[in-house]
Regions:
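N-terminal "arm"/small-domain region of PLP-dependent enzymes with the aminotransferase-like
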Residues: 1-44, 131-132
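Residue-level marker for buried hydrophobic side chains located in beta-strands
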Residues: 17, 168-169
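Conserved core of the PLP fold type I
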Residues: 22, 41-162, 169, 174-180
Length: 180
């Protein structure tokens, strides 16, 4: 499976996680549907985002306003950050696509004082209790440090942000590569 992806064909023992792929994807019906509707998909692309969010909301039985359809992570991050108001707390080092979308005066940064940049939910709660923000953004596991907060820690952080009326944004793009 892994030999089909990445650019490390000279190093077959190396696994390349640069591309987000799903080896368990059920291809049986979706490929057939795409083939059947290919002429429509090509001639009528792109569908209105309203149509896409409505279809997704019906599929997952959630409110339509909870769905933001997009063409990849970069577009979704851009839309998300443009809609945020107030200040945002980030943890650095981090994936800079998020904070780079805002002026510096709106971004408040936590940097772990530990040599390996490790931190946990208690470190974040302690810091952001003294540096109030409107939104807390957590990438978990973090890119590039690889720091990971367990599900129990995430729940504690989510409860704390709810209690403090802080919007909590959790990006778990690479959570499939973690344990716990």
């Amino acid at each position: 499976y892994y030999s089909r992806y990445g650019g490390f064909w000279r190093f077959p023992e190396m696994l390349d996680y640069c591309y987000l792929v799903n080896p368990y994807f059920n291809r049986s019906s979706i490929i057939a549907d795409m083939q059947e509707f290919f002429p429509v998909l090509v001639s009528e692309y792109p569908s209105g985002m309203g149509v896409n969010s409505l279809l997704a909301s019906k599929c997952w039985n959630i409110k339509q306003e909870y769905v933001i359809p997009g063409n990849g992570a970069a577009e979704l991050i851009k839309v998300l950050m443009e809609d945020l108001v107030g200040t945002i707390g980030v943890i650095r080092p981090t994936f800079e696509e998020y904070p780079n979308r805002l002026p510096d005066e709106r971004v408040f940064t936590f940097v772990s004082k530990k040599a390996d940049f490790r931190y946990d939910e208690d470190d974040l709660i302690e810091y952001f209790s003294t540096v109030p923000v409107d939104t807390l953004l957590l990438i978990n596991p973090d890119n590039p440090s690889g720091n990971f907060i367990s599900m129990q820690g995430i729940r504690k952080l989510a409860d704390w942000t709810k209690q403090k009326n802080i919007q909590f944004i959790l990006d778990e793009s690479f959570v499939d590569f973690t344990y716990g």
